């Protein structure tokens, strides 16, 4: 999504990437989101329970949502529908102003700034392989 920012995993191992991103494997992806109105308890509950996306004719899976600012929240998804967070917010009556992926499974963005990169550590790779070993591609 060109309107998003944050963590990207780059690899020559397509099978690994498929296992990570495949919705049926329920791997966590975490985002920080800024919207155009205050984050309320009602909004959090609706998002957490799953939201009906009429464009895709599907209800999103339950997810974890936590308020981190007046108009900001953190969301952890185990699904990867196209523009899912933007569509969920739209269905709840708000617009996404900023969307940043901060974690994919055990790999976090940390303090990296836009344009910076780092190699995944041996420990992170070992844990990643352990988590995806039962996953389907």
Predicted segment positions?
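Basic, flexible Lys/Arg- and Gly-enriched helix-loop patches that mediate nucleic-acid binding at interfaces
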Residues: 2-137
